[in-house]
Structures are given as structure tokens and as C-alpha cells.
């Protein structure tokens, strides 16, 4: 029973876990936590809050579809909320993770049904969501439709032609093709 209106505290266990499993210092973790609790006083982020934040970054498009996939990937315990630990682990991977870590994270997002592989339908759904989020300023010519883009990706990556991408095929394919890596991880050239 806490004091009414009191904000959740960062536990020592979570702090130690995040120090060991992220590239953030203790001070940075505490600073991130302070901002997180300020924005999410209940100590977790709902899907609705998450979508609202994403919409602010992509005002000309429809971010809801893509947000569903990103939210699912952040929410590793499938609680329907993103707690601070899940949030900071995802921020760490997406902002300062190795290429392999970023690709593993992207793979989990693309693997919509969670079966450990990505099929062409899953790839198309993600590409459609990305196009919707980016909005009308991104020209979607017939040559660059989600279906054609997915087919091109599978032609390059599906080594054994079983119509599914394993994590290894996905990572190896992206590491071998810088353009695909940038597209599939939303990585921008620095």
C-alpha cells in the first residue's frame, strides 16, 4: 500500500539488471526513469499512450498499424503494458545495440505470430504498416508495393526456399545487404 499519488520507485534489482544488460550508466538509467515516470505516473506505458507518442513523430501518416507491431515487440512479457525495464531494454537495442542485436529485435517484430520464423504474409503486413506510417510523401509506385518488396526480400534471404525466414537467414541476409539492413531496421545512414 503506497501513499496515494506516490510514484513508483526503481527497484535496486531492476537498476542492477539494467546496468548489466544495457549500455547506460546508473545515472543515465535514473534520468531515463525520472522521465518515464513523469510521462507514465502509473509506472507503465499503455498501447494508447504509445500510439499517441508515435503519432507525434509521424503526423502525416497513420502510425497505428506499425505501433501495434512495435508495442508487441517492446512488451516482452505480453502484459499489455510496457514497463520501464522493457522500455529501456528496447531503447538500448534500437539506439546503441550491435547490428546483430538490432536485427534480432527487428526479427521479433516481423515474426508476428511468434513462431520463430517470418513468412511472406507477415513481411507484407509490416511493410504495409511502415508505408501507412510514413504517409503520402512516400511514393508507393507499383514497382515498390508491399507485396513486391516482400517478394524481393524473400528472393534475397530465403536461402533454402521454404517460404519462411529463420533468424539466421534474416540476420545473414541483412548483414550481406546494407540497403536491406537499413530498410528492415529503419537504420538511417549517419
From Swiss-Prot:
Keyword Repeat assigned: yes
Q: Which domain of life is it from?
A: Eukaryota
Q: Which InterPro entries match?
A: EF-hand-dom_pair, EF_Hand_1_Ca_BS, EF_hand_dom, Recoverin
Its tissue distribution reads: Expressed in neuronal processes in the ventral nerve cord.
Annotated Ca(2+) 3 binding sites: 158, 160, 162, 164, 169
Which positions in this protein are listed as binding Ca(2+) 2?
111, 113, 115, 117, 122
Output one GO MF annotation.
Answer: calcium ion binding
Task: Enumerate the residues binding Ca(2+) 1.
Answer: 75, 77, 79, 86
* SUPFAM superfamilies reported in the protein's UniProt record: EF-hand
Keywords carried by this UniProt record: Calcium, Metal-binding, Repeat
All copies of domain EF-hand, residue ranges: 24-59, 62-97, 98-133, 145-180
| Pfam families referenced in this protein's UniProt entry, alphabetically | EF-hand_1 (PF00036), EF-hand_7 (PF13499)
Biological processes per GO annotation: regulation of signal transduction
Instruction: Briefly state the protein's biological role.
Output: Neuronal calcium sensor, regulator of G protein-coupled receptor phosphorylation in a calcium dependent manner.
Q: Which family does it belong to?
A: Belongs to the recoverin family.
Query: What does the miscellaneous comment read?
Result: Probably binds two or three calcium ions.
The name this protein goes by in its record: Neuronal calcium sensor 2
What species is given as this protein's source? Caenorhabditis elegans
Q: Which gene encodes it?
A: ncs-2
